[in-house]
Structures are given as structure tokens and as C-alpha cells.
Regions:
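Transmembrane alpha-helices of multi-pass inner-membrane enzymes
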Residues: 47, 361-373, 379-405
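Alpha-helical transmembrane segments of multi-pass inner-membrane proteins
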Residues: 123-154, 166-235
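Transmembrane signal-anchor hairpin modules in multi-pass inner-membrane enzymes, especially those
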Residues: 1-85, 120-124, 130, 187-199, ...
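Hydrophobic alpha-helical membrane-interfacial segments at the cytosolic entry of transmembrane helices
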Residues: 73-76, 130-139, 203-206, 239-260
Length: 405
């Protein structure tokens, strides 16, 4: 019972951290302000000291009964932390630049640190993590709408600016855009008036995120959301036709009320694709490969944490990031680090697939943002990516379903 209570407190702390993250912080904050300090403190309290020490010393490798993904994950974390860190120190990169690489690495490996601590209360922990991510996503969307001066009429007319801190790049925005309408429609189809009111609020929150992504013409996020809704629609057509009728009715009503915005947004996506193409991702990959091939040491171990890359995607400026996880890992950690990363994510992939089978709504809500973050987006460095991975693994391990829809 004590273990369950501690797990609940950890999950509650993570929920509060996510709420503060969405309402007061940024996906990639430039400095540590009071909000970031509080979020960091809550994360440290959630993780504790014992689990990181066990991971750092290799004690977790001796534990029996661990799921098959944990051992390769712990080994991958050791390789990706220490080899590039020593390489960065050897090449005398700036300490601040090294920290900006190491912290996102720890975010990405949050499942290693958090999942074992939350297993004592998986149901509540999954609910709190999912709720926190949804609130964070809506918070980011609201703040973006505020800086856009609530210009809903501009959607489909012109591409709206992302803003200086790229609030909509947070994977939690796409998570909320998929999860909230999906769960909300289910809540509308059955239950009392309180449940239906909550369903209306969920649908509106999700639509707020979706329309924001359409206004800023986030092509990949919109495409992944469309795939998720199509997959869920086909599933529900067989299992819950009433929910499909409800969702179809809402979609038809919105298309009837706002045809210019809907078709205009589709036109904006097509126009951006024509003008921007792949957003110089191929040129960026070529630059990362060139840096990796600059020497045998760079090929094996990369240039280390803290290295900068002359990135064609940002006009040739020397920056600490690339826009895809593969090129980032290749440039910074070399082939050795890239193999460790593949082993880690490959170990988690069956968990995500299992979640798609056991809880399709949560599975699709998690899969879309993760595909975006880990495939072709800088958001692989963000806090919510690591917590989405944590949510997926924890939910899959316990066959968790959120409240009946």
C-alpha cells in the first residue's frame, strides 16, 4: 500500500509539472526561469535518487523479472550518455552546449527512470500522465492563440506565424488534438449530463489544438491526426457505430459551418508542400553525414555532446540541433550511438504496438506525436516526448484502459 501511495504522489507531481509546462514554460526554453525550476524540481522528486543510482551503477541489470525492454534501454542510456560526453569534453565543447544535449537525452530515457517507479499504481499513473499531457497541449494551444490575437478567421486564409518559442511544436499539442476529441465523442454517446458536459469540453479542447495546427500549417501533425481519426473511425464503425455517428455528425456540422476555413487549410497545406517540400531535410542529412565522415573517431563516436553543426536548414548557422533524431544522433554520437538508440527504441516499439491493440484510442493518441517527434521533427528533444514514451510503456504493460468511453 505504501508503494502504491508513493507511486501516486510521483504521478501527481508529474501531472502538476505538465500543467506548469503547458501554461508557463516553452517546449525548448532558452533559460531557466522560476517555472522551469519548479518543473525540474517536480521531475527530480518524481524520479527520486535511488532509481537513477541503480541505473548509473548497473544495479538494474542484475534485477530479475524486469521486462525485456529494460536491459537494452539501460545499456543504451550508458552508451549514449558517457561516450558522447567524454568525446565532448575531449574536444573542449562549451559546457552549456553539452548540457543542452544531455538534458534532452535524459528526457528521451524517462521510461527507464519512471516506469518502474509507477508500476505500483499503473491505472492512476496512466490517467494522470494522459491528463497532464492533454492539459499541457491545450495550454500551449491557448497561449499560441493568444499571441495570434485569437485570429480564428485567418485559418485557411493565410499561414499564421509559429511565434518565437514554437509552442505548437510540442508533441502534447498533437496528443491533445487526437485524444480529447476521441475520448470526448465517446463520453457524449453515453453517461449522465456531467459526463456529457465533460465530453463537450474535451471535444472543444481538442478542436482548439487541431485548428491551431491548421492555422500554423503544421503539415505532419495534421496528416498524423487525420490518419489517427481514420483508423479509429474504421475501428469504431465495427465496435461502436453510435460513436462514429456522433463523430461524423460533429465533423459534418463543422464542415457546413466553416467550409472556407476547412478547404482553405487544405489548400495551405498543399501550397506549403509545393513551396517548402521537405524543408531542406535532405541537405541537413547530408551535412550531418559529412560531419560524421570527417574522421574515423567521428564516424564511430560522433562529435560528442555540445558539438555544433553548420545546418543548411537554418541558413548555414552553426547550431546544436538537427530536425531529425537520426541525423542528430549520427552527428553527435556516431554509428555506435545510433545503434544504441535503435536498440532502445526498438525495444519500446512492441509496447506501443501492444497499446494500439489493447487501447486503440490512447495508442493512436500516443503514436502520432511519437512518430512526429522521433521521425522528422526537433521535438524529440522535448520533455513531453519522454513522458509520452513513459505513458505508452506503462499503459501497455498493464493493459491499461482509460475510463470507459
Amino acid at each position: 500500500m505504501a508503494g502504491k501511495g508513493v507511486a501516486l504522489w510521483r504521478a501527481a507531481g508529474l501531472f502538476v509539472a505538465l500543467v506548469l509546462y503547458g501554461l508557463l514554460s516553452a517546449p525548448a526554453p532558452a533559460e531557466i526561469r522560476p517555472a522551469e525550476a519548479v518543473i525540474g524540481a517536480l521531475l527530480v522528486l518524481g524520479v527520486g535518487l535511488l532509481r537513477p543510482l541503480c541505473v548509473a551503477t548497473g544495479q538494474t541489470l542484475l534485477e530479475r523479472g524486469s521486462p525485456p525492454w529494460e536491459m537494452p534501454a539501460v545499456l543504451a542510456l550508458a552508451v549514449l550518455l558517457w561516450c558522447p560526453l567524454m568525446r565532448g569534453v575531449w574536444l573542449d565543447w562549451a559546457p552549456g552546449d553539452m548540457v543542452r544535449d544531455v538534458v534532452p537525452l535524459l528526457y528521451l530515457f524517462l521510461p527507464v527512470l519512471l516506469v518502474p517507479l509507477l508500476r505500483a499504481a499503473p491505472d492512476r499513473a496512466v490517467g494522470l500522465l494522459a491528463g497532464g499531457l492533454a492539459v499541457a497541449g491545450v495550454g500551449f494551444a491557448l497561449r499560441w492563440w493568444k499571441q495570434a490575437e485569437w485570429g480564428f478567421g485567418a485559418v485557411g486564409v493565410r499561414a499564421m506565424a509559429d511565434g518565437g518559442v514554437y509552442l505548437l511544436n510540442a508533441p502534447s499539442v498533437l496528443f491533445a488534438a487526437i485524444a480529447l476529441p476521441a475520448f470526448g465523442v465517446g463520453m457524449l454517446t453515453r453517461g449522465g449530463w456531467l459526463r456529457r458536459a465533460a465530453g463537450v469540453a474535451a471535444v472543444l479542447g481538442g478542436l482548439l489544438c487541431l485548428v491551431a495546427l491548421a492555422g500554423a500549417v503544421h503539415r505532419m501533425a495534421l496528416g498524423l491526426a487525420a490518419i489517427a481519426f481514420a483508423a479509429l473511425g474504421l475501428l469504431w464503425l465495427r465496435r461502436a457505430p453510435l460513436a462514429v455517428l456522433g463523430a461524423g455528425g460533429i465533423a459534418l456540422l463543422l464542415a457546413t459551418l466553416f467550409p472556407e476555413a476547412l478547404f482553405g487549410a487544405l489548400g495551405q497545406v498543399a501550397e506549403k508542400t509545393r513551396l517548402a517540400g521537405a524543408n531542406t531535410r535532405w541537405e541537413e542529412a547530408e551535412a550531418a553525414l559529412g560531419q560524421a565522415l570527417s574522421s574515423p573517431a567521428a564516424f564511430l563516436f560522433g562529435q560528442g555532446w555540445g558539438a555544433l553543426l553548420a545546418n543548411p536548414a537554418v541558413g548555414g548557422w552553426r547550431v546544436s540541433y538537427t530536425h531529425t533524431l537520426v541525423t542528430y544522433a549520427l552527428a553527435k554520437t556516431g554509428v555506435v550511438g545510433l545503434c544504441a538508440l535503435i536498440a532502445y527504441l526498438g525495444g519500446l516499439a512492441p509496447r506501443v504496438l501492444a497499446l494500439l491493440r489493447s487501447d486503440p484510442v490512447l495508442g493512436w493518441a500516443v503514436s502520432g506525436p511519437l512518430l512526429m517527434a522521433l521521425g522528422a521533427h526537433t521535438s524529440f528533444k522535448y520533455l513531453d516526448t519522454g513522458l509520452l514514451l513513459t505513458l505508452a510503456v506503462l499503459a501497455a504493460e498493464r493493459g491499461k484502459r482509460l475510463p470507459p468511453r
